[in-house]
Amino acid sequence: MAEAISAALPTRDQVVPSRKRVKLPPWLEVAKPRLIPLLLATTLGGMALTEGWPLSSPRLVCTLGGGALASAAAGVLNCLWEQDLDGRMARTSGRALPSGRLSPTSAFIGAIACTLAAAMLLVSGVNCLAAGLSLLGLCSYVLLYTALLKPRTTQNIVIGGVAGAIPPLVGAAAATGHVGLGGWWLFALVMVWTPAHFWALALLLREDYRAVGIPMLPVVKGPVVTARAIRRYGWATVLLSGFGVLALPTGGVFYGLILLPFNGRLIQMVQRLSMDPDSLMAAKGLFRWSILYLFGICLLLILSRTDLASSFDQQVMFVLQQLPIV
């Protein structure tokens, strides 16, 4: 009976990716390189929210390079910690460590090398605050989320999401040597964005998580409760994103106007899932859009710091000043 039920369930390859995945070398696979671009995008977003934008090319390269290395180290340590768990899940049993294509010793050496390289690059090429925050992000992902929260509570991603929200702080620290209100705003935005994004994926993979006893919200509470929680966090993301108008040093009006269709689409996807919590297509659509949404927000923050956006803001303010006061 269990085998029949398992056979009837959709696989991850059927519901998540839109195209065939590229086969990566084992040493690169464990670094989880597909997660790195979004982390670097939020790092750039944190930079764009400061008066230090744009950064000099050497500092920019050191910040992004150090962030990528720290993220890679975190990915490898996560794979090391979860190799037994991955080996028991059909979806992940073919990964480099549980399949034996890469030895744990080699992976651990790689993680240490990436960590040291990240620290050296950030300390020497950026500043100690940026380096410390990057290492804090690494530790919070491996120790707080992976080791402590993930196997114990349905709120694992709510609290553990702090790891993914640290890159904006790194970006702000790299640009100015401190973290201002703009950096903390983007940190908070990523924190409230994360649950809706991750729970959409967890809805697709809930039977995998159930099989190995990981208490993800869809496993413990079911799709209906999960969809309601996603709706709450989706609306919180939309509301908080609007404060970027105030967080930006320049270009806030431009940001606010271009933000509207992004938020409209996010709410549309959230509502669609809320109306049909069992729909894998709705969960899949929300998961994909949430990634594009955060990429779009970070790109919008950067564009808002251009001379064109500043000029647009000035023209809008001039027009508003000419309106008669009733």
UniProtKB/Swiss-Prot annotation:
InterPro entries: Protohaem_IX_farnesylTrfase, UbiA_prenyltransferase, UbiA_prenylTrfase_CS, UbiA_sf
Pfam families listed in its UniProt record: UbiA
EC numbers for this chain: 2.5.1.141
Any one of the GO CC terms: plasma membrane
Record keywords, A-Z: Cell inner membrane, Cell membrane, Heme biosynthesis, Membrane, Transferase, Transmembrane, Transmembrane helix
Highest taxon, organism lineage: Bacteria
Catalytic activity line of the entry: heme b + (2E,6E)-farnesyl diphosphate + H2O = Fe(II)-heme o + diphosphate
Its membrane topology: Multi-pass membrane protein
GO biological process: heme O biosynthetic process
Residue ranges of the TM segments: 35-55, 60-80, 106-126, 129-149, 157-177, 185-205, 242-262, 283-303
CDD domains: PT_UbiA_Cox10 (cd13957)
Intracellular or extracellular location(s): Cell inner membrane
Extra facts: Carbon 2 of the heme B porphyrin ring is defined according to the Fischer nomenclature.
Similarity field: Belongs to the UbiA prenyltransferase family. Protoheme IX farnesyltransferase subfamily.
Entry protein name: Protoheme IX farnesyltransferase
Organism of origin: Parasynechococcus marenigrum (strain WH8102)
Classification lineage: Bacteria, Bacillati, Cyanobacteriota, Cyanophyceae, Synechococcales
Gene label: ctaB
